Protein backbone atom coordinates (compact mmCIF):
# COMPACT_ATOMS: atom_id res chain seq x y z
CA UNK A 1 0.00 0.00 0.00
CA UNK A 2 2.96 2.35 0.42
CA UNK A 3 3.87 2.32 -3.26
CA UNK A 4 0.59 3.89 -4.52
CA UNK A 5 0.74 6.50 -1.78
CA UNK A 6 4.26 7.52 -2.76
CA UNK A 7 3.22 7.78 -6.39
CA UNK A 8 0.33 10.06 -5.49
CA UNK A 9 2.66 12.18 -3.37
CA UNK A 10 5.08 12.58 -6.27
CA UNK A 11 2.27 13.66 -8.59
CA UNK A 12 1.11 16.15 -5.99
CA UNK A 13 4.58 17.63 -5.67
CA UNK A 14 4.91 17.90 -9.44
CA UNK A 15 1.65 19.79 -9.65
CA UNK A 16 2.72 22.25 -6.95
CA UNK A 17 6.43 22.93 -7.16
CA UNK A 18 8.02 25.35 -4.69
CA UNK A 19 8.88 28.03 -7.25
CA UNK A 20 5.49 28.55 -8.78
CA UNK A 21 3.72 30.24 -5.92
CA UNK A 22 1.92 33.54 -6.83
CA UNK A 23 4.05 36.68 -7.09
CA UNK A 24 2.43 40.01 -6.18
CA UNK A 25 2.82 43.02 -8.47
CA UNK A 26 2.67 45.47 -5.60
CA UNK A 27 2.84 45.48 -1.86
CA UNK A 28 0.04 46.65 0.43
CA UNK A 29 1.67 50.04 0.55
CA UNK A 30 1.86 50.32 -3.22
CA UNK A 31 5.66 49.72 -3.63
CA UNK A 32 7.25 46.63 -5.11
CA UNK A 33 7.99 44.34 -2.13
CA UNK A 34 10.74 41.84 -1.45
CA UNK A 35 9.21 38.37 -1.16
CA UNK A 36 10.40 35.79 1.32
CA UNK A 37 9.19 32.23 0.88
CA UNK A 38 7.89 30.70 4.06
CA UNK A 39 9.38 27.34 4.89
CA UNK A 40 7.20 24.65 6.44
CA UNK A 41 7.15 24.89 10.17
CA UNK A 42 8.20 28.51 10.51
CA UNK A 43 6.27 30.65 12.92
CA UNK A 44 4.16 33.49 11.61
CA UNK A 45 3.12 32.28 8.22
CA UNK A 46 3.54 28.55 7.70
CA UNK A 47 1.03 27.17 5.24
CA UNK A 48 -0.75 24.35 7.01
CA UNK A 49 -2.70 21.47 5.58
CA UNK A 50 -6.46 21.50 5.74
CA UNK A 51 -6.32 18.30 7.81
CA UNK A 52 -4.71 20.16 10.67
CA UNK A 53 -7.03 21.39 13.35
CA UNK A 54 -5.03 24.47 14.16
CA UNK A 55 -7.15 27.62 13.65
CA UNK A 56 -5.93 31.03 12.75
CA UNK A 57 -6.36 34.03 14.98
CA UNK A 58 -9.39 36.25 14.40
CA UNK A 59 -9.10 38.99 11.78
CA UNK A 60 -7.23 41.97 13.14
CA UNK A 61 -7.48 45.65 12.23
CA UNK A 62 -5.16 46.77 9.45
CA UNK A 63 -6.01 44.03 7.00
CA UNK A 64 -5.38 45.30 3.45
CA UNK A 65 -6.06 43.94 0.00
CA UNK A 66 -3.27 44.07 -2.57
CA UNK A 67 -4.04 45.06 -6.14
CA UNK A 68 -4.79 41.89 -8.19
CA UNK A 69 -1.62 40.38 -9.59
CA UNK A 70 -0.92 38.28 -12.65
CA UNK A 71 0.31 34.69 -12.57
CA UNK A 72 2.70 33.15 -15.07
CA UNK A 73 1.26 30.35 -17.29
CA UNK A 74 3.23 27.29 -18.19
CA UNK A 75 5.05 26.97 -21.50
CA UNK A 76 3.57 24.81 -24.29
CA UNK A 77 5.06 21.40 -24.68
CA UNK A 78 6.00 21.10 -21.00
CA UNK A 79 3.75 18.85 -19.05
CA UNK A 80 4.40 20.78 -15.86
CA UNK A 81 1.58 23.30 -15.40
CA UNK A 82 1.71 26.65 -13.64
CA UNK A 83 -0.50 27.66 -10.75
CA UNK A 84 -3.17 29.02 -13.14
CA UNK A 85 -4.06 27.74 -16.62
CA UNK A 86 -2.88 29.56 -19.75
CA UNK A 87 -4.87 32.63 -20.82
CA UNK A 88 -7.20 32.04 -23.76
CA UNK A 89 -6.28 35.45 -25.22
CA UNK A 90 -2.75 36.87 -25.22
CA UNK A 91 -3.12 40.56 -25.93
CA UNK A 92 0.61 41.33 -25.99
CA UNK A 93 1.55 38.59 -28.50
CA UNK A 94 2.02 40.98 -31.42
CA UNK A 95 4.87 39.25 -33.25
CA UNK A 96 3.88 35.87 -34.73
CA UNK A 97 6.58 33.20 -34.39
CA UNK A 98 8.74 35.32 -32.07
CA UNK A 99 8.90 35.99 -28.36
CA UNK A 100 7.58 39.39 -27.30
CA UNK A 101 9.55 40.87 -24.41
CA UNK A 102 7.73 40.88 -21.05
CA UNK A 103 4.75 39.10 -22.58
CA UNK A 104 4.30 36.33 -20.04
CA UNK A 105 1.55 34.59 -22.01
CA UNK A 106 3.46 34.40 -25.32
CA UNK A 107 3.70 30.69 -26.25
CA UNK A 108 6.61 31.48 -28.57
CA UNK A 109 8.81 32.25 -25.52
CA UNK A 110 8.65 28.61 -24.27
CA UNK A 111 9.23 29.70 -20.69
CA UNK A 112 8.06 27.62 -17.76
CA UNK A 113 8.42 30.54 -15.36
CA UNK A 114 8.50 33.83 -17.33
CA UNK A 115 8.97 35.92 -14.19
CA UNK A 116 12.43 34.47 -13.72
CA UNK A 117 13.42 35.79 -17.15
CA UNK A 118 11.37 38.96 -17.57
CA UNK A 119 11.61 41.92 -15.22
CA UNK A 120 7.82 42.23 -15.20
CA UNK A 121 4.75 40.96 -17.01
CA UNK A 122 2.83 43.24 -19.31
CA UNK A 123 -0.75 44.02 -18.29
CA UNK A 124 -3.12 41.39 -19.63
CA UNK A 125 -0.46 38.71 -20.07
CA UNK A 126 -1.30 36.87 -16.82
CA UNK A 127 -4.49 36.27 -14.93
CA UNK A 128 -5.54 38.79 -12.33
CA UNK A 129 -5.41 37.79 -8.70
CA UNK A 130 -6.09 39.30 -5.28
CA UNK A 131 -4.00 39.35 -2.13
CA UNK A 132 -5.19 40.07 1.41
CA UNK A 133 -2.40 41.17 3.76
CA UNK A 134 -1.92 41.81 7.49
CA UNK A 135 1.10 42.56 9.59
CA UNK A 136 3.25 39.45 9.87
CA UNK A 137 3.58 39.83 13.65
CA UNK A 138 -0.13 39.21 14.08
CA UNK A 139 -0.01 35.72 12.53
CA UNK A 140 1.29 32.80 14.59
CA UNK A 141 0.18 29.94 12.36
CA UNK A 142 -1.95 29.84 9.21
CA UNK A 143 -4.22 27.03 8.06
CA UNK A 144 -5.62 28.95 5.06
CA UNK A 145 -6.50 26.77 2.04
CA UNK A 146 -5.11 29.50 -0.22
CA UNK A 147 -1.46 30.14 -1.06
CA UNK A 148 0.27 32.62 1.26
CA UNK A 149 3.51 34.56 1.27
CA UNK A 150 5.42 37.09 3.35
CA UNK A 151 6.39 40.36 1.68
CA UNK A 152 8.61 43.24 2.68
CA UNK A 153 7.01 46.62 2.03
CA UNK A 154 8.84 49.87 1.29
CA UNK A 155 9.06 50.69 5.00
CA UNK A 156 10.77 47.38 5.83
CA UNK A 157 7.69 45.91 7.54
CA UNK A 158 6.95 42.27 6.85
CA UNK A 159 3.43 41.60 5.59
CA UNK A 160 1.71 38.24 5.63
CA UNK A 161 -0.43 37.93 2.49
CA UNK A 162 -2.94 35.29 1.40
CA UNK A 163 -3.83 34.77 -2.24
CA UNK A 164 -7.62 34.89 -2.62
CA UNK A 165 -9.33 33.22 -5.54
CA UNK A 166 -11.38 36.15 -6.89
CA UNK A 167 -13.01 34.70 -9.96
CA UNK A 168 -14.76 37.97 -10.84
CA UNK A 169 -11.47 39.46 -12.03
CA UNK A 170 -11.30 36.92 -14.84
CA UNK A 171 -14.86 37.11 -16.06
CA UNK A 172 -15.39 37.90 -19.73
CA UNK A 173 -17.37 40.97 -20.76
CA UNK A 174 -20.53 39.96 -22.53
CA UNK A 175 -20.53 41.17 -26.11
CA UNK A 176 -23.45 43.23 -27.34
CA UNK A 177 -25.11 42.38 -30.58
CA UNK A 178 -24.94 45.27 -33.04
CA UNK A 179 -27.20 45.52 -36.06
CA UNK A 180 -28.74 48.20 -38.22
CA UNK A 181 -31.55 48.69 -35.71
CA UNK A 182 -29.53 49.50 -32.60
CA UNK A 183 -26.34 50.87 -34.19
CA UNK A 184 -27.33 54.53 -33.94
CA UNK A 185 -28.68 54.09 -30.39
CA UNK A 186 -25.46 52.48 -29.15
CA UNK A 187 -23.31 55.12 -30.85
CA UNK A 188 -25.36 57.92 -29.30
CA UNK A 189 -25.38 56.31 -25.82
CA UNK A 190 -21.71 55.40 -25.50
CA UNK A 191 -20.08 57.67 -28.09
CA UNK A 192 -18.60 61.11 -27.52
CA UNK A 193 -18.00 64.16 -29.65
CA UNK A 194 -17.16 63.50 -33.27
CA UNK A 195 -14.73 65.33 -35.52
CA UNK A 196 -17.41 65.51 -38.21
CA UNK A 197 -20.89 66.84 -37.70
CA UNK A 198 -23.57 64.18 -37.57
CA UNK A 199 -26.05 64.07 -40.39
CA UNK A 200 -29.30 65.72 -39.43
CA UNK A 201 -32.15 63.49 -40.43
CA UNK A 202 -34.84 65.88 -39.25
CA UNK A 203 -37.15 67.22 -41.88
CA UNK A 204 -36.74 70.85 -43.02
CA UNK A 205 -39.08 73.47 -41.54
CA UNK A 206 -42.37 74.08 -43.25
CA UNK A 207 -41.80 77.81 -43.75
CA UNK A 208 -39.07 80.46 -43.73
CA UNK A 209 -38.29 82.46 -40.61
CA UNK A 210 -36.73 85.91 -40.55
CA UNK A 211 -33.02 85.64 -41.28
CA UNK A 212 -33.17 82.12 -42.73
CA UNK A 213 -31.13 81.57 -45.92
CA UNK A 214 -33.23 81.41 -49.07
CA UNK A 215 -32.99 78.11 -50.96
CA UNK A 216 -32.54 78.02 -54.73
CA UNK A 217 -32.72 75.16 -57.24
CA UNK A 218 -30.85 74.74 -60.53
CA UNK A 219 -32.98 72.40 -62.69
CA UNK A 220 -30.20 71.93 -65.25
CA UNK A 221 -27.88 70.29 -62.72
CA UNK A 222 -30.49 69.23 -60.10
CA UNK A 223 -28.57 71.12 -57.43
CA UNK A 224 -29.97 72.91 -54.36
CA UNK A 225 -28.07 76.02 -53.31
CA UNK A 226 -28.57 79.35 -51.54
CA UNK A 227 -29.41 82.80 -52.84
CA UNK A 228 -26.18 84.77 -52.47
CA UNK A 229 -25.71 88.46 -51.76
CA UNK A 230 -21.97 89.17 -52.13
CA UNK A 231 -20.59 91.60 -49.55
CA UNK A 232 -17.31 93.49 -49.24
CA UNK A 233 -14.69 92.22 -46.80
CA UNK A 234 -11.37 93.69 -45.76
CA UNK A 235 -10.00 97.15 -46.35
CA UNK A 236 -10.31 96.78 -50.13
CA UNK A 237 -13.93 95.59 -49.91
CA UNK A 238 -13.32 92.43 -51.93
CA UNK A 239 -16.43 90.44 -52.87
CA UNK A 240 -17.24 87.51 -50.56
CA UNK A 241 -19.46 85.14 -52.52
CA UNK A 242 -20.44 83.01 -49.51
CA UNK A 243 -22.66 85.68 -47.92
CA UNK A 244 -26.24 84.30 -47.99
CA UNK A 245 -29.30 86.49 -48.38
CA UNK A 246 -31.54 86.45 -45.29
CA UNK A 247 -35.30 86.05 -45.52
CA UNK A 248 -37.15 89.35 -44.90
CA UNK A 249 -33.83 91.20 -44.53
CA UNK A 250 -33.94 94.05 -47.03
CA UNK A 251 -30.44 95.44 -47.41
CA UNK A 252 -27.83 96.49 -49.93
CA UNK A 253 -24.17 95.54 -50.18
CA UNK A 254 -21.26 96.76 -52.27
CA UNK A 255 -18.01 95.03 -53.10
CA UNK A 256 -15.11 95.30 -55.54
CA UNK A 257 -13.65 92.73 -57.92
CA UNK A 258 -10.10 92.88 -59.26
CA UNK A 259 -9.05 91.06 -62.41
CA UNK A 260 -5.56 89.88 -63.30
CA UNK A 261 -6.61 89.06 -66.84
CA UNK A 262 -9.88 90.74 -67.74
CA UNK A 263 -9.64 89.52 -71.33
CA UNK A 264 -10.18 85.91 -70.21
CA UNK A 265 -12.47 86.70 -67.27
CA UNK A 266 -14.80 88.79 -69.42
CA UNK A 267 -16.72 85.82 -70.82
CA UNK A 268 -15.74 83.10 -68.31
CA UNK A 269 -16.39 84.73 -64.93
CA UNK A 270 -19.98 83.99 -63.86
CA UNK A 271 -20.04 87.09 -61.64
CA UNK A 272 -19.92 89.26 -64.77
CA UNK A 273 -22.57 87.28 -66.65
CA UNK A 274 -26.16 88.46 -66.25
CA UNK A 275 -27.58 84.96 -66.79
CA UNK A 276 -26.05 83.68 -63.55
CA UNK A 277 -28.38 85.95 -61.57
CA UNK A 278 -31.68 84.59 -62.91
CA UNK A 279 -31.13 81.13 -64.48
CA UNK A 280 -32.47 79.32 -61.40
CA UNK A 281 -35.65 79.00 -59.36
CA UNK A 282 -36.32 79.90 -55.74
CA UNK A 283 -37.92 77.39 -53.38
CA UNK A 284 -41.16 78.77 -52.02
CA UNK A 285 -40.70 77.13 -48.60
CA UNK A 286 -37.78 75.14 -47.08
CA UNK A 287 -39.68 71.83 -47.15
CA UNK A 288 -39.54 72.09 -50.91
CA UNK A 289 -35.99 70.71 -50.77
CA UNK A 290 -37.47 67.25 -50.10
CA UNK A 291 -38.98 67.34 -53.60
CA UNK A 292 -37.28 70.20 -55.47
CA UNK A 293 -38.46 69.02 -58.88
CA UNK A 294 -42.06 69.60 -57.85
CA UNK A 295 -43.13 72.75 -59.67
CA UNK A 296 -45.45 73.58 -56.77
CA UNK A 297 -42.43 74.58 -54.68
CA UNK A 298 -40.50 76.43 -57.42
CA UNK A 299 -40.74 80.18 -58.02
CA UNK A 300 -39.05 81.36 -61.25
CA UNK A 301 -36.88 84.48 -61.24
CA UNK A 302 -38.35 87.06 -63.63
CA UNK A 303 -35.99 89.42 -65.44
CA UNK A 304 -37.43 92.96 -65.52
CA UNK A 305 -34.60 94.71 -67.36
CA UNK A 306 -32.65 94.19 -70.53
CA UNK A 307 -29.58 92.02 -70.02
CA UNK A 308 -27.00 91.03 -72.61
CA UNK A 309 -24.25 88.46 -72.40
CA UNK A 310 -20.72 89.79 -71.81
CA UNK A 311 -18.75 90.42 -74.96
CA UNK A 312 -15.08 91.16 -75.53
CA UNK A 313 -14.84 93.75 -78.28
CA UNK A 314 -11.29 94.82 -78.88
CA UNK A 315 -9.95 96.41 -75.72
CA UNK A 316 -13.35 96.63 -74.01
CA UNK A 317 -15.35 94.09 -72.03
CA UNK A 318 -18.97 94.98 -72.68
CA UNK A 319 -22.17 94.16 -70.78
CA UNK A 320 -20.63 93.28 -67.41
CA UNK A 321 -23.01 93.30 -64.43
CA UNK A 322 -22.54 96.29 -62.13
CA UNK A 323 -25.80 96.22 -60.14
CA UNK A 324 -28.27 93.47 -59.15
CA UNK A 325 -31.65 94.28 -57.56
CA UNK A 326 -33.94 91.50 -56.33
CA UNK A 327 -37.60 92.20 -55.54
CA UNK A 328 -39.09 89.35 -53.49
CA UNK A 329 -42.77 89.17 -52.58
CA UNK A 330 -43.71 87.04 -49.57
CA UNK A 331 -46.98 85.85 -48.08
CA UNK A 332 -46.34 85.01 -44.44
CA UNK A 333 -45.95 81.30 -43.73
CA UNK A 334 -46.91 80.51 -47.33
CA UNK A 335 -43.41 81.58 -48.29
CA UNK A 336 -42.05 83.34 -51.35
CA UNK A 337 -44.61 84.06 -54.05
CA UNK A 338 -42.75 86.13 -56.63
CA UNK A 339 -39.13 87.00 -57.43
CA UNK A 340 -37.96 89.58 -59.96
CA UNK A 341 -34.50 90.89 -60.75
CA UNK A 342 -33.26 93.98 -62.55
CA UNK A 343 -29.66 94.25 -63.71
CA UNK A 344 -27.39 97.18 -64.42
CA UNK A 345 -24.55 96.70 -66.89
CA UNK A 346 -21.45 98.66 -67.82
CA UNK A 347 -18.31 98.38 -69.92
CA UNK A 348 -14.77 97.82 -68.65
CA UNK A 349 -11.51 98.67 -70.32
CA UNK A 350 -9.13 95.72 -70.52
CA UNK A 351 -6.01 96.83 -68.67
CA UNK A 352 -3.70 95.41 -65.99
CA UNK A 353 -5.29 95.56 -62.53
CA UNK A 354 -8.78 96.35 -63.83
CA UNK A 355 -11.48 96.50 -61.16
CA UNK A 356 -15.27 96.51 -60.99
CA UNK A 357 -17.52 97.72 -58.21
CA UNK A 358 -20.80 95.82 -57.92
CA UNK A 359 -23.90 96.78 -55.98
CA UNK A 360 -26.40 94.17 -54.71
CA UNK A 361 -29.85 95.16 -53.44
CA UNK A 362 -32.42 92.88 -51.84
CA UNK A 363 -35.92 94.18 -51.17
CA UNK A 364 -38.84 92.30 -49.60
CA UNK A 365 -42.46 93.34 -49.71
CA UNK A 366 -45.83 91.79 -49.00
CA UNK A 367 -47.50 89.82 -51.75
CA UNK A 368 -50.35 91.48 -53.70
CA UNK A 369 -49.18 94.91 -52.61
CA UNK A 370 -50.41 97.66 -54.94
CA UNK A 371 -47.98 99.00 -57.51
CA UNK A 372 -48.38 102.58 -56.30
CA UNK A 373 -47.52 101.60 -52.76
CA UNK A 374 -44.53 99.54 -53.84
CA UNK A 375 -42.93 102.53 -55.57
CA UNK A 376 -42.81 104.58 -52.39
CA UNK A 377 -39.70 104.41 -50.27
CA UNK A 378 -39.80 102.65 -46.90
CA UNK A 379 -40.40 104.79 -43.86
CA UNK A 380 -37.47 106.31 -42.03
CA UNK A 381 -39.53 106.64 -38.86
CA UNK A 382 -43.11 106.84 -37.68
CA UNK A 383 -43.51 109.71 -37.34
CA UNK A 384 -40.10 111.08 -36.32
CA UNK A 385 -36.86 110.18 -38.04
CA UNK A 386 -34.76 107.35 -36.62
CA UNK A 387 -31.02 107.95 -36.49
CA UNK A 388 -29.32 105.95 -39.23
CA UNK A 389 -32.37 105.74 -41.49
CA UNK A 390 -32.28 107.35 -44.97
CA UNK A 391 -33.06 111.04 -45.36
CA UNK A 392 -36.09 111.15 -47.66
CA UNK A 393 -36.09 113.48 -50.67
CA UNK A 394 -38.80 114.34 -53.19
CA UNK A 395 -38.71 115.32 -56.85
CA UNK A 396 -42.11 115.83 -58.39
CA UNK A 397 -44.29 113.06 -56.96
CA UNK A 398 -41.51 110.50 -56.49
CA UNK A 399 -39.81 110.06 -53.13
CA UNK A 400 -36.42 108.42 -52.67
CA UNK A 401 -33.37 108.47 -50.43
CA UNK A 402 -30.95 111.38 -50.70
CA UNK A 403 -27.51 110.23 -51.81
CA UNK A 404 -23.82 111.17 -51.71
CA UNK A 405 -20.87 110.60 -53.98
CA UNK A 406 -19.29 107.15 -54.02
CA UNK A 407 -15.88 106.30 -55.46
CA UNK A 408 -14.83 103.15 -57.26
CA UNK A 409 -11.67 101.21 -56.60
CA UNK A 410 -9.64 103.49 -58.85
CA UNK A 411 -11.05 106.67 -57.26
CA UNK A 412 -13.40 107.62 -60.09
CA UNK A 413 -17.03 108.53 -59.40
CA UNK A 414 -19.43 105.59 -59.37
CA UNK A 415 -23.02 105.51 -60.58
CA UNK A 416 -23.88 103.84 -57.28
CA UNK A 417 -24.09 106.37 -54.47
CA UNK A 418 -24.13 106.39 -50.65
CA UNK A 419 -27.41 107.01 -48.85
CA UNK A 420 -27.58 110.05 -46.57
CA UNK A 421 -28.40 108.67 -43.12
CA UNK A 422 -30.33 110.87 -40.74
CA UNK A 423 -28.21 112.20 -37.88
CA UNK A 424 -24.95 110.86 -39.33
CA UNK A 425 -22.40 113.42 -40.52
CA UNK A 426 -20.46 112.19 -43.53
CA UNK A 427 -17.98 113.23 -46.18
CA UNK A 428 -17.20 111.52 -49.47
CA UNK A 429 -15.32 112.33 -52.63
CA UNK A 430 -14.30 111.04 -56.01
CA UNK A 431 -12.67 112.11 -59.25
CA UNK A 432 -14.85 112.96 -62.22
CA UNK A 433 -13.24 112.38 -65.60
CA UNK A 434 -14.57 114.70 -68.31
CA UNK A 435 -14.01 115.32 -71.94
CA UNK A 436 -13.20 118.80 -73.21
CA UNK A 437 -16.46 120.71 -73.64
CA UNK A 438 -17.91 124.17 -73.22
CA UNK A 439 -18.42 125.78 -69.82
CA UNK A 440 -22.18 125.28 -69.57
CA UNK A 441 -21.87 121.55 -70.23
CA UNK A 442 -19.17 121.18 -67.58
CA UNK A 443 -21.26 123.03 -65.01
CA UNK A 444 -24.37 120.97 -65.73
CA UNK A 445 -22.51 117.66 -65.61
CA UNK A 446 -20.74 118.48 -62.34
CA UNK A 447 -23.91 119.79 -60.65
CA UNK A 448 -25.76 116.58 -61.51
CA UNK A 449 -22.87 114.52 -60.21
CA UNK A 450 -22.79 116.37 -56.90
CA UNK A 451 -26.50 116.26 -55.99
CA UNK A 452 -27.44 113.16 -57.98
CA UNK A 453 -30.09 112.40 -60.54
CA UNK A 454 -32.81 113.55 -60.27
CA UNK A 455 -32.07 116.72 -58.39
CA UNK A 456 -33.73 116.75 -54.93
CA UNK A 457 -36.30 119.52 -54.53
CA UNK A 458 -37.87 118.77 -51.15
CA UNK A 459 -36.96 116.88 -47.98
CA UNK A 460 -39.44 115.02 -45.78
CA UNK A 461 -40.13 116.77 -42.48
CA UNK A 462 -40.94 113.47 -40.76
CA UNK A 463 -39.84 109.95 -41.56
CA UNK A 464 -43.32 108.83 -42.65
CA UNK A 465 -44.06 111.71 -45.04
CA UNK A 466 -46.51 110.96 -47.86
CA UNK A 467 -45.44 112.20 -51.32
CA UNK A 468 -49.05 113.07 -52.09
CA UNK A 469 -49.23 115.54 -49.19
CA UNK A 470 -46.94 118.45 -49.99
CA UNK A 471 -47.36 119.92 -46.52
CA UNK A 472 -45.17 117.18 -45.11
CA UNK A 473 -42.14 118.29 -47.16
CA UNK A 474 -39.84 121.30 -46.88
CA UNK A 475 -38.17 122.94 -49.87
CA UNK A 476 -34.39 122.73 -50.19
CA UNK A 477 -32.61 126.10 -50.12
CA UNK A 478 -29.76 126.49 -52.60
CA UNK A 479 -26.75 128.77 -52.31
CA UNK A 480 -24.76 128.82 -55.51
CA UNK A 481 -21.37 130.34 -56.20
CA UNK A 482 -20.96 134.11 -56.51
CA UNK A 483 -20.27 134.73 -60.18
CA UNK A 484 -19.71 138.47 -59.71
CA UNK A 485 -16.62 137.80 -57.61
CA UNK A 486 -14.76 136.44 -60.62
CA UNK A 487 -12.54 139.00 -62.32
CA UNK A 488 -11.42 136.76 -65.16
CA UNK A 489 -13.68 137.11 -68.19
CA UNK A 490 -12.42 134.02 -70.01
CA UNK A 491 -12.84 131.70 -67.02
CA UNK A 492 -15.41 129.00 -66.28
CA UNK A 493 -16.76 128.67 -62.75
CA UNK A 494 -17.34 125.01 -61.89
CA UNK A 495 -18.59 123.59 -58.56
CA UNK A 496 -16.18 121.29 -56.73
CA UNK A 497 -17.91 120.84 -53.38
CA UNK A 498 -21.43 120.45 -52.02
CA UNK A 499 -22.29 120.77 -48.33
CA UNK A 500 -25.74 119.56 -47.31
CA UNK A 501 -26.75 121.39 -44.15
CA UNK A 502 -29.70 119.85 -42.29
CA UNK A 503 -31.32 121.63 -39.33
CA UNK A 504 -33.43 119.31 -37.19
CA UNK A 505 -35.01 119.28 -33.75
CA UNK A 506 -37.00 117.14 -31.36
CA UNK A 507 -40.70 117.90 -30.96
CA UNK A 508 -43.51 116.38 -28.94
CA UNK A 509 -43.49 114.86 -25.49
CA UNK A 510 -40.32 114.93 -23.45
CA UNK A 511 -40.87 111.26 -22.64
CA UNK A 512 -41.14 110.31 -26.33
CA UNK A 513 -39.61 113.04 -28.52
CA UNK A 514 -39.82 112.81 -32.31
CA UNK A 515 -37.07 114.08 -34.63
CA UNK A 516 -38.15 116.25 -37.54
CA UNK A 517 -36.31 118.27 -40.18
CA UNK A 518 -36.66 122.03 -39.86
CA UNK A 519 -34.73 123.04 -42.97
CA UNK A 520 -32.17 121.90 -45.57
CA UNK A 521 -29.68 123.95 -47.57
CA UNK A 522 -27.33 123.03 -50.42
CA UNK A 523 -24.13 125.08 -50.17
CA UNK A 524 -21.87 124.91 -53.23
CA UNK A 525 -18.17 125.79 -53.39
CA UNK A 526 -16.67 126.60 -56.79
CA UNK A 527 -13.36 127.22 -58.48
CA UNK A 528 -12.58 128.92 -61.77
CA UNK A 529 -10.72 127.40 -64.70
CA UNK A 530 -9.78 129.02 -67.96
CA UNK A 531 -11.78 128.07 -71.01
CA UNK A 532 -8.57 127.38 -72.87
CA UNK A 533 -7.48 124.91 -70.18
CA UNK A 534 -8.38 121.34 -71.00
CA UNK A 535 -10.22 119.92 -67.98
CA UNK A 536 -9.92 116.11 -67.89
CA UNK A 537 -10.30 115.35 -64.19
CA UNK A 538 -12.05 117.20 -61.35
CA UNK A 539 -11.94 116.23 -57.66
CA UNK A 540 -15.42 116.51 -56.15
CA UNK A 541 -16.48 116.43 -52.50
CA UNK A 542 -19.84 116.14 -50.74
CA UNK A 543 -20.38 116.85 -47.05
CA UNK A 544 -23.43 116.22 -44.86
CA UNK A 545 -23.78 118.17 -41.63
CA UNK A 546 -26.70 117.69 -39.22
CA UNK A 547 -27.33 120.48 -36.70
CA UNK A 548 -29.58 119.90 -33.68
CA UNK A 549 -31.53 123.09 -32.95
CA UNK A 550 -33.78 121.64 -30.27
CA UNK A 551 -34.80 124.23 -27.67
CA UNK A 552 -35.92 122.39 -24.61
CA UNK A 553 -38.74 124.19 -22.74
CA UNK A 554 -38.44 125.13 -19.09
CA UNK A 555 -39.75 122.46 -16.77
CA UNK A 556 -43.28 123.20 -15.48
CA UNK A 557 -43.53 124.96 -12.12
CA UNK A 558 -46.41 124.96 -9.62
CA UNK A 559 -48.44 128.11 -8.75
CA UNK A 560 -47.09 130.05 -5.70
CA UNK A 561 -48.99 129.57 -2.45
CA UNK A 562 -50.61 132.55 -0.69
CA UNK A 563 -48.77 133.30 2.56
CA UNK A 564 -50.35 136.34 4.33
CA UNK A 565 -48.08 137.98 6.89
CA UNK A 566 -48.22 141.31 8.71
CA UNK A 567 -45.07 143.40 8.90
CA UNK A 568 -42.78 142.51 11.72
CA UNK A 569 -43.15 145.96 13.38
CA UNK A 570 -46.90 146.42 12.76
CA UNK A 571 -47.70 146.54 16.51
CA UNK A 572 -44.45 148.27 17.38
CA UNK A 573 -45.87 151.50 18.95
CA UNK A 574 -48.38 149.64 21.08
CA UNK A 575 -45.91 147.00 22.13
CA UNK A 576 -43.36 149.61 23.18
CA UNK A 577 -45.92 151.58 25.12
CA UNK A 578 -47.23 148.49 26.84
CA UNK A 579 -43.76 147.34 27.76
CA UNK A 580 -42.92 150.74 29.27
CA UNK A 581 -46.13 150.73 31.31
CA UNK A 582 -45.34 147.38 32.75
CA UNK A 583 -41.79 148.34 33.62
CA UNK A 584 -42.80 151.58 35.37
CA UNK A 585 -45.42 149.74 37.44
CA UNK A 586 -46.24 152.09 40.28
CA UNK A 587 -44.21 155.08 39.17
CA UNK A 588 -46.60 156.48 36.56
CA UNK A 589 -49.77 155.75 34.70
CA UNK A 590 -49.39 154.38 31.19
CA UNK A 591 -49.96 157.03 28.50
CA UNK A 592 -52.09 154.59 26.61
CA UNK A 593 -54.39 154.17 29.56
CA UNK A 594 -54.68 157.93 29.91
CA UNK A 595 -55.48 158.24 26.23
CA UNK A 596 -58.22 155.65 26.54
CA UNK A 597 -59.75 157.46 29.49
CA UNK A 598 -59.78 160.73 27.59
CA UNK A 599 -61.54 159.09 24.67
CA UNK A 600 -64.15 157.59 26.94
CA UNK A 601 -64.74 160.99 28.51
CA UNK A 602 -65.26 162.64 25.15
CA UNK A 603 -67.72 159.97 24.14
CA UNK A 604 -69.68 160.41 27.33
CA UNK A 605 -69.94 164.15 26.76
CA UNK A 606 -71.31 163.65 23.28
CA UNK A 607 -73.94 161.25 24.46
CA UNK A 608 -75.15 163.59 27.17
Curated annotation (Swiss-Prot):
Residues 45-54 have a biased composition (Polar residues). InterPro entries: Tectonic (IPR040354), Tectonic_dom (IPR011677). It holds the Pfam family TCTN_DUF1619. The chain crosses the membrane at residues 587-607. It is a single-pass type I membrane protein. Coiled coil: none annotated. The keyword Chloroplast does not apply. GO terms for cellular component: membrane. Residues 23-58 are annotated as: Disordered. Residues 608 are cytoplasmic. Residues 1-22 form the signal peptide. Its main location: membrane. Disulfide bonds: none annotated. GO terms for biological process: apoptotic process; cilium assembly; smoothened signaling pathway. Residues 23-586 are extracellular. Keywords: Apoptosis, Cilium biogenesis/degradation, Glycoprotein, Membrane, Signal, Transmembrane, Transmembrane helix. It comes from the Eukaryota. The keyword Membrane applies. Glycans are attached at residues 78, 179, 347. Belongs to the tectonic family. Part of the tectonic-like complex (also named B9 complex). Part of the tectonic-like complex which is required for tissue-specific ciliogenesis and may regulate ciliary membrane composition. May be involved in apoptosis regulation. Necessary for signal transduction through the sonic hedgehog (Shh) signaling pathway. This is Tectonic-3. It comes from Macaca fascicularis.
Amino acid sequence: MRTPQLALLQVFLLMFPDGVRPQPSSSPSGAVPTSLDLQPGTVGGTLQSSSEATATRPAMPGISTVVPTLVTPSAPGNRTVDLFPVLPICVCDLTPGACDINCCCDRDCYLLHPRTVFSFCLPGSVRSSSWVCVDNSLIFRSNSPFPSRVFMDSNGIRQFCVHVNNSKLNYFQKLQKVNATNFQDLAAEFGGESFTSTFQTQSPPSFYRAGDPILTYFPKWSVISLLRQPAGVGAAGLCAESNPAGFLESKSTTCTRFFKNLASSCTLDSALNAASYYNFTVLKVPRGMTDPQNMEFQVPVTLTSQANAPLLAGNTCQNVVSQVTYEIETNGTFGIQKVSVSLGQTNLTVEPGASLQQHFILHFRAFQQSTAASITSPRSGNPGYIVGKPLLALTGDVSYSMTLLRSQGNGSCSVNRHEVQFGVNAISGCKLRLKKADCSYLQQEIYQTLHGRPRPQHVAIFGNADPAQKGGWTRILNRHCNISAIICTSCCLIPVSLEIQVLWAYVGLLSNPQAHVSGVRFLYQCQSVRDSQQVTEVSLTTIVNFVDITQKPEPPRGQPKMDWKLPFDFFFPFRVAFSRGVSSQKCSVSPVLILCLLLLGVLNLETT
